Structures are given as C-alpha cells and as structure tokens.
From Swiss-Prot:
Essential cofactor(s): Mg(2+); Mn(2+); thiamine diphosphate
Co-factor binding details: Binds 1 thiamine pyrophosphate per subunit.
Naturally occurring in which organism (per UniProt): Prochlorococcus marinus (strain SARG / CCMP1375 / SS120)
Family designation: Belongs to the TPP enzyme family. MenD subfamily.
Name of encoding gene: menD
EC code: 2.2.1.9
SUPFAM superfamilies found in the cross-reference section: Thiamin diphosphate-binding fold (THDP-binding)
Function: Catalyzes the thiamine diphosphate-dependent decarboxylation of 2-oxoglutarate and the subsequent addition of the resulting succinic semialdehyde-thiamine pyrophosphate anion to isochorismate to yield 2-succinyl-5-enolpyruvyl-6-hydroxy-3-cyclohexene-1-carboxylate (SEPHCHC).
CDD domains, per the entry: TPP_PYR_MenD, TPP_SHCHC_synthase
Recorded metabolic or biological pathway in which this protein acts: Quinol/quinone metabolism; 1,4-dihydroxy-2-naphthoate biosynthesis; 1,4-dihydroxy-2-naphthoate from chorismate: step 2/7; Cofactor biosynthesis; phylloquinone biosynthesis
GO BP, one annotated term: menaquinone biosynthetic process
Protein name: 2-succinyl-5-enolpyruvyl-6-hydroxy-3-cyclohexene-1-carboxylate synthase
Signal peptide (residue range): none
Pfam family, any one: TPP_enzyme_C
Length: 574
C-alpha cells in the first residue's frame, strides 16, 4: 500500500473478508500513518462503481480490495464500465493458494480469469507469497500495475494468493508498521511511464478535412484524462475559429459556454429535419457518438469526409463505420492540420459563416418554442426537468445524469445551461447499474453534486445507500419516478400479442421510496411542481450526505410531449 501511495494512490475502497485480512490491516495502518482516504463497502459491486466515480473525477486510479470467491465476480459490471469509459481502477483481490485450486476447496474459484476480457492487464502474484520475492520484483509489480491502469486508462486486476495464518498477531502488526521488511529486501522506486505503448496509433495515417468546404464539428461525450481537457478545449476553439464551422456539442462534451459557434439545440434541429445533411458536408467528430438516433441517421446521409478524433482511445469508436479515426488527440491532429494549411486565417470560409449564422438564428427559434412548451408550465415533466433544473442550481455544482432517459432529455432540451458547468454520465457501456455508487464516488472528490436518475436506476443500485457517503456536503438525488422504465414508452414497439409493455419491459416496482430513505436515515421529500423543487433544492443544499427528492412524472404523457415539441418545431420553423 505504501508503494502504491508513492506512485500517487489517494483513495482506497475496502470490502470485508477474511482471506483479505492482511490487506485490510495494511489499509488500517496506512490510514493511521498517512491519512489516506479509505472507505468501506459491504457490496463489492457498489464499491467498484464508487471507486470508478472517484477515478473519473480525480484522473487517478482508486484501489478496490476484496476477499476471494464470488466477491471478485461482483467487480465485473464496474470493470466493464471502466474499460469502455477508459477510467483507471485497480482491483486487488485476495485468493486461495494454488494448491487449493481444482480440488473442491471452500470459496475457491478461478477468480483470476473473471476480469480478463475487460482488464488492461491481470497480474497473478507468485504463489510463494509477496514476502518471498525480491525488492526489485516487488516494486516492478507495483510499478507495472499502476502504469497499466494509467497509460491507456482502464481496469487492472492484481490477484494475490494468501496462505494462512491470515490474521497477524498484535506484535507482528506492530513490527510491520514500525518498518519491518523481509530479509534482503531492497526498497527502490522505479520511474512510471504513462505513455501508451499501443502500436496501432499510427500518426502517419492522419485523416484530412478541407477547410475551404462546408463542415460541422460534432463533440461527443468527453472521454479523456482530466489533464487533457484544457488543451482539448483550446484546440476546439482554434479549429472552429479557423473554419467557422458550427459546433454541435453534447451536454457531456465538457465544452464551455465561452466556445464560439455553439449550437445548443442541434439534436432537435436534426430530429425535426430543420437542418439536414448533404453530400458536401464534412464532419469533424470528437470522441464517442452521442446517444441520438436522429444523429445516426444524419451522419449516414453525409457522404463527404468524416474524421473521428479520440483522446488516446485506441479502439474504433464509429458504430456507423463512416469515419476515419485518429487516436492521437485533437491537439496533435490540429498541429498536422495547420501545417497542411499554413496560410489559413480565422473564418476564411464565407459559406460556413453563412451556415453558422443561419443555424444560430434557428437555434434561437428552437429555444423560444421549447420554452413555450416547457418553461411556461409549472408542471413537472422529464423534458421540463432537463430544461429548467440547471437554472435552479448554483453553477459551481456539477450534475451527473443516469443512463436511459435523463441523458437523452438533457441532450435535447437543456439548451446552453450544461455548458456553464460540468455534466457527467457514464456512457462506456451505458448501463443503469451502479449509478448511485458512481455519483457518490464523484461527490467524494468533487464536493456537492446533483444526480438525476430514474426510479429503476435508483432501485437497481439502492445498495449504494449503505455507503453512507459523502459525509460533509450534500449529494442530492433527484429521483424521476415514472413508474418503471419510461424509456420503453418512447420506443417504436409493435403491439404485443400476449402480455403488456409494463409487464415485459417497463417493470414498475411497488417500493415506497420514502420508507426506503427512512430505513437508511436519508432526508426525503416528494415534489409536484417547480416551486416545490426549487424549495427542496434550497433545503437540500444546507444538508450533509445523501438527500432524496422524488418527482413523479407520467411517461406516456412525456412521450407525447416530446413528439409534440418535434412536430411543433417542423411547423414553427419550416
């Protein structure tokens, strides 16, 4: 634990167990001597998601420690998300000795294989024990584990077989804490390299765009290291100023309100066919694709060049198979782009300037009509929450959106408000599991946070309420209760021959959320109007720890409202 701390470890999540007792004792000692941030969690699945939230906010790997057996299998959902979202996390799992494998020994499974498909690396420690290897081998193992988690960020699994006795005596613990080391143990620190070693990133193969022709910039959800964000924003600003291209930015893109050429209602402009694609339109795509079917159709009808830039993400990120990908980051690509056009000045292209001006005007018209539908009515709906919520919360408080409906509604209806603060969502695998735990992890590092989630996402991760975090400031859970998976009401489902949408898809649950909150000693309110929501937010910001605000909505009415807005835009602008 000390060795990891020297490389930058700041947060540990500890799960209970006997086989992992030596690791738990080490964490306890580290808390006393260094004040490292350590948290406990009885549910390994929730623990792992919380750790991902911390890592997403900090940019550094959080370590999760578990015992052997099924405890390790519970790490898989979070490991999948960390892999797809490129977030560093280290799982340290205690294991039974090799001699107990394959012979029916209790709580002994092939746990070293559980996380292999999604981990950057799986390290199996020598069966002789860590105390029997040389100092150089020991520190090489620590170095490689930390390095693999950060070079191409993602999960790393360190599996440690531990022999009995598992529980050191008081005197043995004291001796270790006072600096005991194995004989001939040379303590060294090896330098860390965080440069990706992936040979598939070939900077010579640089896809090009023509700044003299029309185009748009499409910024998807931000997927990069926190240290890369400032440079990314500067590069976006510079490219947009060179070309005059409009910028369609996802609410999760981390683009700021200061960015020129920003089109906030682009998803509605596309879905209402107010802005349509054509053969001449080029697209600079930044990061993963936004969750919009209208956008996918739009891109399929764009037959010109599409270039996809990722911030070190080495896998191909275009499910449409239309774009040429460059994985070396926007700053790197922009340098090459500028060298190919040395005489390029700001806003050279008049056609693109005209396109931008037209879109800015239409964007304003869309906003006006959306406000007529959503802002002038005090009734709580899912689209109106997306439109109004951010104006009720101080701009220094970040927001997390759960998967499913919230992230889609904020993409469509929130306007410019998301670009005044950071919005988070975990879109790697886009599951509804772990949302509360992820939010808790974010809030541990970021401070006060608001998470918007549906009732099924909330109930799916209700074990997160056992984490009892954060301690000193509020985590406001805005629970949109639409009586099940409301997103299924938005799908074009054919009439069901036997059964019902509720029974087979939406699956409403008869859980009293107020009683659940009371059981966990969590403050709770139900609201039915935006005046009540505003009052509840003011109340919750004065509290510490999780706070639940429940807003009841009607998914069928909200589905019709979304359709009416899109249809109304077609008539209003076209």
């Amino acid at each position: 634990m000390r060795a990891f701390q020297r490389y930058g470890l700041e947060h540990i999540v500890l799960c209970p167990g006997s086989r992992s007792a030596p690791l738990a004792l080490a964490v306890g000692a580290l808390i006393e001597e260094s004040g490292i941030n350590a948290y406990t969690a009885i549910d390994e699945r929730s623990a792992a998601f919380m750790a991902i939230g911390i890592s997403a906010a900090s940019g550094k790997a959080t370590i999760v420690i578990t015992t052997s057996g099924t405890a390790v299998s519970n790490l898989l959902p979070a490991a999948v998300e960390a892999d797809r979202s490129c977030l560093p996390i280290i799982f340290i799992t205690a294991d039974r000795p090799l001699r107990l494998k394959g012979c029916g020994s209790n709580q002994t499974v092939n746990q070293e294989d559980f996380l292999v498909p999604v981990c950057r690396e799986v390290f199996n420690c020598p069966s002789i024990g860590l105390h029997e290897i040389s100092g150089r081998s020991f520190f090489t193992l620590v170095k490689k584990t930390w390095e693999k988690a950060h070079a191409y960020p993602g999960p790393v699994h360190l599996n440690i077989p531990i022999e009995e006795p598992l529980h050191a005596s008081f005197l043995e613990q004291k001796e270790v804490c006072n600096g005991w080391k194995p004989l001939n143990f040379e303590e060294i620190q090896l330098p860390i390299s965080t440069v990706s070693t992936n040979t598939r990133i070939k900077t010579k193969e640089v896809p090009e765009l023509d700044p003299s022709q029309p185009g748009i910039i499409l910024a998807g959800p931000w997927r990069g290291k926190p240290s890369q964000l400032l440079g990314f924003r500067k590069a976006v600003k510079e490219f947009q100023s060179f070309t005059g291209w409009p910028l369609f930015a996802d609410c999760l893109s981390a683009i700021t309100i200061k960015q020129s050429g920003l089109i906030s209602f682009w998803e509605l402009l596309i879905s209402a066919q107010i802005f349509e694609s054509n053969d001449k339109l080029q697209v600079l795509r930044l990061g993963p694709l936004s969750c919009s079917r209208a956008l996918e159709s739009f891109l399929r009808n764009t037959n010109k060049k599409q270039v996809l830039i990722t911030e070190g993400e080495e896998r191909y990120l275009d499910p449409l198979h239309l774009a040429k990908q460059y994985s070396g980051g926007l700053q790197s690509w922009l340098k090459i782009f500028k060298s190919n056009y040395p005489n390029l000045n700001n806003n050279l292209v008049n056609d693109d300037t005209n396109i931008l001006e037209d879109l800015l005007n239409k964007n304003q018209l869309v906003g006006d009509l959306v406000d007529k539908y959503l802002k002038e009515d005090s009734k709580i709906t899912e689209p109106s929450i997306a439109r109004k919520l951010l104006d009720l919360i101080p701009e220094d408080i970040p927001i997390m959106l759960s998967a499913s409906s919230p992230v889609r509604d904020f993409l469509a209806y929130s306007g410019f408000s998301p670009f005044k603060r950071r919005l988070y969502s975990f879109r790697g695998a886009s599951g509804i599991d772990g949302n509360l735990s992820l939010a808790i992890g974010l809030s541990i590092f970021l401070g006060p946070l608001v998470v918007v989630c549906g009732d099924l996402a909330f109930l799916h991760d209700s074990n997160a309420l056992l984490l009892n975090q954060p301690k000193k400031y509020p985590l406001i859970i805005l629970l949109i209760d639409n009586n099940g998976g409301g997103i299924f009401k938005q799908l074009s489902l054919a009439p069901i021959f036997k059964g019902s949408v509720d029974k087979l898809f939406s699956m409403p649950q008869s859980i009293n959320i107020g009683d659940l909150a009371k059981a966990h000693n969590i403050p709770f309110r139900t609201i039915s109007s935006f005046d009540e929501l505003n009052s509840a937010l003011e109340w919750s910001l004065k509290l510490s720890g999780p706070v639940i605000i429940r807003a009841c909505t009607n998914s069928e009415e909200d589905t019709l409202l979304r359709k009416n807005i899109t249809d109304g835009l077609k008539k209003y602008i076209n």
